[in-house]
């Protein structure tokens, strides 16, 4: 199965300071693109580090306090998804994620699936990404 792991804050949402999570604006173009991938049969997993710092990585607290807000926001903005995965480690304000299968939100919006596959081949020419 083809699966997309999509970040929430700053990817599905428009990142604005001093705006509560429930009031974050949706990235409409990205959500429209996500719907197209869903039509193509992709499984969509939302993978988020929301409130990992706030609750010091305590997943039960995040499930209780944060997950209902996430679900409400996704429904409000008609975001297709199959699963929500909480607990993505937070890289901090000055850190970042490094992954051979990652693309930027702007690339997800502007490139089609074949172009994305070609882009990812530059980092890892093996179709399985080394995962056997």
Each model region followed by its residue ranges:
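Catalytic phosphate/metal-binding cores of nucleic-acid and nucleotide-processing enzymes, i.e., regions
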Residues: 1-132
């Amino acid at each position: 199965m083809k699966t997309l792991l999509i970040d929430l804050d700053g990817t599905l949402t428009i990142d604005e300071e001093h705006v509560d999570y429930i009031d974050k604006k949706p990235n409409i173009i990205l959500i429209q693109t996500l719907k197209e991938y869903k039509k193509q049969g992709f499984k969509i997993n939302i993978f988020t580090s929301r409130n990992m710092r706030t609750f010091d990585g305590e997943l039960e607290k995040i499930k209780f306090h944060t997950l209902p807000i996430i679900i409400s926001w996704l429904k409000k903005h008609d975001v297709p998804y199959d699963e929500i995965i909480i607990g993505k480690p937070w890289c901090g304000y000055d850190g970042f994620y490094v992954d051979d299968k990652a693309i930027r939100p702007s690339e997800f919006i502007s490139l089609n699936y074949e172009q994305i596959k070609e882009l990812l081949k530059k980092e890892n020419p093996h179709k399985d990404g080394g995962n056997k």
